[in-house]
Amino acid sequence: MFIISSKNMLQKAQHAGYAVPAFNIHNLETLQVVVETAAEMRSPLIVAGTPGTFSYAGMGNIVAIAGDLAREYNLPLAIHLDHHESLADIESKVMAGIRSVMIDGSHFPFEENVALVKSVVDFCHRYDTSVEAELGRLGGIEDDLVVDSKDALYTNPQQAREFVARTGIDSLAVAIGTAHGMYAAEPKLDFERLAEIRALVDIPLVLHGASGLPESDIRQAISLGVCKVNVATELKIAFSDALKEYFLQNPKANDPRHYMQPAKQAMKEVVRKVIHVCGCEGQL
């Protein structure tokens, strides 16, 4: 079986002190890049897609292509539902073969968040599907959802302990000062808060908003218990910038088999860098 749950993957990372990258993909080319690069580096891999990605590319297409690539490269991987908000949506995708989900109820009050997440956990665990949830809110833009910086909330360590105990989630996405999208100025991450959460919570922790973070910050977060690092915007920028440059240099280009190559190569360099920073090369 090549499409797997991320639970054991993250537990192994937690015990060994590295993190597994979760790369957001959008189409055939971006999916090819992350799978091929992870296979070359023998890195565990989580392929992430937002509701918008699954709507755009097609649920069946993503699962089929990812499964074919995983078999071709002998690379078990997790296809992960990133920032999904609907139990019904998650149920349908789990029944279609997904085994790793994130239910995002972070915009709800604490008790409503707990209730929603618990309902997802109760369903998903019947199908050996791992569940990630978020406590606190990241600022920035994710899948056309905008969270203003004033509405971003840091994760409360004591609440995190209660949240994990009451919901039974497999991993916890924490808010410690990161944001979705690229940073206008270098962010100041609250590593003291992260250490407090780690002391109270024994499941793998997840860092969203890693695009553009200094490598030293990512490494420090991993040393304090982060086992999954999400990267999306940095991949899109590398891909689209290379594509734009190709058309500037080749304005009459019309063959996607040619103009997609430099875009894929640029994205591949970002994927290689992230795998290296996460310390997961050779961890298969």
Swiss-Prot record:
Keywords tagged on the record: Galactitol metabolism, Lyase, Metal-binding, Zinc
Principal EC category: lyase
Catalytic reaction(s) noted: D-tagatofuranose 1,6-bisphosphate = D-glyceraldehyde 3-phosphate + dihydroxyacetone phosphate
Entry's EC annotation: 4.1.2.40
Ligand binding (Zn(2+)): 83, 180, 208
Disulphide linkage map: none
Function statement: Catalytic subunit of the tagatose-1,6-bisphosphate aldolase GatYZ, which catalyzes the reversible aldol condensation of dihydroxyacetone phosphate (DHAP or glycerone-phosphate) with glyceraldehyde 3-phosphate (G3P) to produce tagatose 1,6-bisphosphate (TBP). Requires GatZ subunit for full activity and stability. Is involved in the catabolism of galactitol.
A single Gene Ontology CC term: cytosol
Parts forming coiled coils: none
Annotated pathway: Carbohydrate metabolism; D-tagatose 6-phosphate degradation; D-glyceraldehyde 3-phosphate and glycerone phosphate from D-tagatose 6-phosphate: step 2/2
Protein name, as recorded: D-tagatose-1,6-bisphosphate aldolase subunit GatY
GO BP term, pick one: D-tagatose 6-phosphate catabolic process
Record carries keyword Manganese: no
Cofactor(s) needed for function: Zn(2+)
Lineage: Bacteria, Pseudomonadati, Pseudomonadota, Gammaproteobacteria, Enterobacterales
InterPro entries according to UniProt: Aldolase_TIM (IPR013785), Class_II_FBP_aldolase (IPR050246), FBA_II (IPR000771), TagBP_ald_KbaY/GatY (IPR011288), TagBP_aldolase_GatY (IPR023955)
Binding sites annotated in the UniProt record for dihydroxyacetone phosphate: 181, 209-211, 230-233
Family: Belongs to the class II fructose-bisphosphate aldolase family. TagBP aldolase GatY subfamily.
Gene Ontology molecular function: tagatose-bisphosphate aldolase activity; zinc ion binding
Recorded superkingdom: Bacteria
The protein's assembly and partners: Forms a complex with GatZ.
Pfam families, A to Z: F_bP_aldolase
Active site: 82
Cofactor, how bound (note): Binds 1 zinc ion per subunit.
Family annotation (NCBIfam families): cbbA, PRK09195.1, PRK12737.1, tag_bisphos_ald
PANTHER family, A to Z: D-TAGATOSE-1,6-BISPHOSPHATE ALDOLASE (PTHR30304), D-TAGATOSE-1,6-BISPHOSPHATE ALDOLASE SUBUNIT GATY-RELATED (PTHR30304:SF0)
